[in-house]
Amino acid sequence: MPLRAPGFWASGYRCTTCREVADAQAERNQLIALERHRASVLQALVQSCGTVEPVDYVALGYVETFFLYSALVAANAGWDDDRISPIDSHPGQLGATPDLTEHVYKTLHGAGIISPAPSSDPRAFSISDVDGSVDFSLRKVSWRLAPDVTGRSMSEVFALLLARLDDPEPEAVTQLWFMIAESECRKYFLKQCERYTYIKSDVYTVKVMDTVRSCLAHLSIGQMWNIIFYVLKDLAALSQEKTYARQHVYNMIPGNIRRYVDHRIGNDRPIHPWRRPSPATESWMSSILLDKVLGEGDSAFEELTGQSVGPSIGFRWRADGD
């Protein structure tokens, strides 16, 4: 008779049939526990959320309108009437980085436009043992849209959002441009970090982000990609020479970005913009902003700067008015 591990005999199951019965019972117990958790979540949601307040979608600000329209488009088949599937199940990227995608959903949730759907996978929720409050995973929960205050259907609300985007506000569009442009630059920065494997991705610090945003006032997204490419390329070479400690090289990134930009602009040297990525790799927010709101496509990526976005909207408005 073959030797068995001590735990085999201690378990009490000495044949295949017994083990199968035990496994089936364990699976049933898990399902029962899951159903109990779902019931607890539903009860806690009802107590904490109550009824969903209607929203006046006509009165939404331009940024909120853009956020909601982009979220619905990115959800694609995951949007059905007043339900939006979990972020992690969406086929494309809403924002260029996960941070931007989550910012959009947090903003919409904070404004009462969307709320967690009780029909979500119960494993997306957790209940506090202290006060019974409900917490949830932003990326794994399903969402429900608040009803329209005038009773519009969700397809009518979507048409309303679409029409609203065609009447852009220069200040709001400038805010969106900086937000999306910085996110696209962060994505490109992290991609270059993967190329130079000895540069850690977490070197994109708050200082680097602030520097990039400052430079974007004078540069297009494509031009900023050019700067990022050469800054990281030179610092990667410097890191390999081992002249400086690696952390010191990382700390040089914000200053080097500023110096590269100042040197090019100060000496009237052109900064050739990198080309816009293909639609297959671009985020939905970037595509909607560049193609629909700004209406300039590739040239908006390669030429528009933070300072020129607002005036370009005003020029379009005057041209359309004529």
Where are these regions (language model features)?
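Basic, alpha-helical nucleic-acid-binding regions used in initiation and control of genome expression
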Residues: G7-A10, E27-D322
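Cysteine-rich micro-motifs
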Residues: P6-D23
